[in-house]
Amino acid sequence: MCALTSVALVSSAQLGMRWSMSRLPSPGQWLDLQDIGQVQSSAIAVICASITAYALSMLFWLLALRDLPLSRAYSLLSISYALVYTLAATLPFFHETFTVSKTVGVTLIVAGVLTINLRRISSPSLQDLSHENQRFR
Protein backbone atom coordinates (compact mmCIF):
# COMPACT_ATOMS: atom_id res chain seq x y z
CA MET A 1 0.00 0.00 0.00
CA CYS A 2 2.87 2.39 0.76
CA ALA A 3 4.37 1.78 -2.69
CA LEU A 4 1.08 2.61 -4.42
CA THR A 5 0.69 5.74 -2.29
CA SER A 6 4.19 6.75 -3.35
CA VAL A 7 3.25 6.18 -7.00
CA ALA A 8 0.09 8.29 -6.65
CA LEU A 9 2.00 11.13 -4.98
CA VAL A 10 4.86 11.17 -7.48
CA SER A 11 2.40 11.05 -10.39
CA SER A 12 0.40 13.97 -9.03
CA ALA A 13 3.65 15.86 -8.46
CA GLN A 14 4.67 15.34 -12.11
CA LEU A 15 1.31 16.53 -13.36
CA GLY A 16 1.32 19.51 -11.00
CA MET A 17 4.78 20.59 -12.09
CA ARG A 18 3.88 20.26 -15.76
CA TRP A 19 0.72 22.33 -15.26
CA SER A 20 2.62 25.01 -13.33
CA MET A 21 5.59 25.25 -15.67
CA SER A 22 3.29 25.81 -18.64
CA ARG A 23 1.94 28.90 -16.85
CA LEU A 24 5.18 30.45 -15.64
CA PRO A 25 7.82 32.46 -17.50
CA SER A 26 11.04 30.68 -18.41
CA PRO A 27 13.32 29.93 -15.43
CA GLY A 28 15.81 32.55 -16.62
CA GLN A 29 13.19 35.23 -15.99
CA TRP A 30 12.25 34.08 -12.48
CA LEU A 31 14.70 36.40 -10.75
CA ASP A 32 13.89 39.42 -12.92
CA LEU A 33 11.87 41.61 -10.57
CA GLN A 34 10.36 43.56 -13.48
CA ASP A 35 8.52 40.42 -14.62
CA ILE A 36 7.14 39.57 -11.18
CA GLY A 37 3.65 40.60 -12.31
CA GLN A 38 3.68 37.83 -14.91
CA VAL A 39 3.95 35.12 -12.28
CA GLN A 40 0.66 33.38 -11.51
CA SER A 41 0.34 32.76 -7.79
CA SER A 42 -1.71 29.62 -8.47
CA ALA A 43 1.17 28.15 -10.49
CA ILE A 44 3.61 28.86 -7.64
CA ALA A 45 1.20 27.27 -5.15
CA VAL A 46 0.90 24.14 -7.30
CA ILE A 47 4.69 23.89 -7.62
CA CYS A 48 5.01 24.10 -3.82
CA ALA A 49 2.31 21.44 -3.44
CA SER A 50 4.09 19.28 -6.02
CA ILE A 51 7.40 19.52 -4.17
CA THR A 52 5.57 18.54 -0.98
CA ALA A 53 4.01 15.59 -2.82
CA TYR A 54 7.49 14.49 -3.94
CA ALA A 55 8.74 14.63 -0.35
CA LEU A 56 5.77 12.62 0.90
CA SER A 57 6.26 10.19 -1.96
CA MET A 58 9.82 9.58 -0.80
CA LEU A 59 8.61 8.94 2.75
CA PHE A 60 6.07 6.38 1.54
CA TRP A 61 8.70 4.86 -0.76
CA LEU A 62 11.03 4.33 2.20
CA LEU A 63 8.20 2.67 4.11
CA ALA A 64 7.48 0.43 1.12
CA LEU A 65 11.12 -0.65 0.90
CA ARG A 66 10.94 -1.82 4.48
CA ASP A 67 8.36 -4.49 3.59
CA LEU A 68 8.61 -5.26 -0.14
CA PRO A 69 11.42 -6.97 -2.01
CA LEU A 70 13.22 -4.37 -4.11
CA SER A 71 12.44 -6.21 -7.35
CA ARG A 72 8.71 -5.90 -6.71
CA ALA A 73 8.75 -2.42 -5.20
CA TYR A 74 10.90 -0.92 -7.94
CA SER A 75 8.70 -2.29 -10.69
CA LEU A 76 5.71 -0.54 -9.11
CA LEU A 77 7.35 2.83 -9.81
CA SER A 78 6.77 2.15 -13.49
CA ILE A 79 3.05 2.50 -12.89
CA SER A 80 3.63 6.23 -12.53
CA TYR A 81 4.73 6.42 -16.18
CA ALA A 82 1.48 4.86 -17.30
CA LEU A 83 -0.58 6.96 -14.91
CA VAL A 84 1.02 10.26 -15.90
CA TYR A 85 0.73 9.47 -19.61
CA THR A 86 -2.93 8.47 -19.31
CA LEU A 87 -3.92 11.48 -17.19
CA ALA A 88 -1.94 13.96 -19.29
CA ALA A 89 -3.60 12.70 -22.47
CA THR A 90 -7.05 12.57 -20.86
CA LEU A 91 -7.19 15.88 -18.99
CA PRO A 92 -7.88 18.74 -21.42
CA PHE A 93 -5.60 21.37 -19.86
CA PHE A 94 -2.42 19.38 -20.60
CA HIS A 95 -3.00 19.35 -24.38
CA GLU A 96 -1.35 15.94 -24.71
CA THR A 97 -2.56 13.30 -27.12
CA PHE A 98 -2.73 9.53 -27.21
CA THR A 99 -0.56 7.98 -29.90
CA VAL A 100 -0.29 4.36 -30.94
CA SER A 101 3.42 4.09 -30.12
CA LYS A 102 3.07 5.69 -26.67
CA THR A 103 0.02 3.60 -25.86
CA VAL A 104 1.79 0.38 -26.90
CA GLY A 105 4.79 1.35 -24.78
CA VAL A 106 2.66 2.11 -21.74
CA THR A 107 0.74 -1.14 -22.24
CA LEU A 108 4.02 -3.05 -22.24
CA ILE A 109 5.08 -1.29 -19.03
CA VAL A 110 1.81 -2.22 -17.32
CA ALA A 111 2.10 -5.81 -18.57
CA GLY A 112 5.62 -5.99 -17.14
CA VAL A 113 4.51 -4.65 -13.77
CA LEU A 114 1.66 -7.15 -13.66
CA THR A 115 3.98 -9.99 -14.66
CA ILE A 116 6.38 -9.15 -11.84
CA ASN A 117 3.82 -8.44 -9.14
CA LEU A 118 0.93 -10.86 -9.66
CA ARG A 119 1.49 -14.05 -7.77
CA ARG A 120 0.53 -17.30 -9.38
CA ILE A 121 -1.78 -19.11 -7.03
CA SER A 122 -1.71 -22.43 -8.85
CA SER A 123 2.03 -22.86 -9.25
CA PRO A 124 4.52 -22.75 -6.35
CA SER A 125 7.68 -20.69 -6.60
CA LEU A 126 11.07 -22.29 -7.21
CA GLN A 127 12.05 -21.40 -3.66
CA ASP A 128 8.98 -23.23 -2.30
CA LEU A 129 9.85 -26.28 -4.40
CA SER A 130 13.44 -26.21 -3.14
CA HIS A 131 12.29 -26.11 0.50
CA GLU A 132 9.84 -28.95 -0.14
CA ASN A 133 12.54 -31.01 -1.85
CA GLN A 134 14.95 -30.50 1.07
CA ARG A 135 12.32 -31.58 3.56
CA PHE A 136 12.08 -35.04 1.97
CA ARG A 137 15.84 -35.70 1.94
From Swiss-Prot:
GO terms for cellular component: plasma membrane. Its main location: membrane. It is a multi-pass membrane protein. InterPro entries: EamA_dom (IPR000620), Flippase_ArnF (IPR022832), Small_drug/metabolite_transptr (IPR000390). The chain crosses the membrane at residues 43-63, 74-94, 98-118. Keywords: Cell inner membrane, Cell membrane, Lipid A biosynthesis, Lipid biosynthesis, Lipid metabolism, Lipopolysaccharide biosynthesis, Membrane, Transmembrane, Transmembrane helix, Transport. It holds the Pfam family EamA. Pathway: Bacterial outer membrane biogenesis; lipopolysaccharide biosynthesis. It is found in: Cell inner membrane. Coiled coil: none annotated. It comes from the Bacteria. One of its GO terms (biological process) is lipopolysaccharide biosynthetic process. One of its GO terms (molecular function) is carbohydrate derivative transmembrane transporter activity. Heterodimer of ArnE and ArnF. NCBIfam families: PRK02971.1-2. Belongs to the ArnF family. Translocates 4-amino-4-deoxy-L-arabinose-phosphoundecaprenol (alpha-L-Ara4N-phosphoundecaprenol) from the cytoplasmic to the periplasmic side of the inner membrane. HAMAP family: Flippase_ArnF. This is Probable 4-amino-4-deoxy-L-arabinose-phosphoundecaprenol flippase subunit ArnF. It comes from Pseudomonas savastanoi pv. phaseolicola (strain 1448A / Race 6).
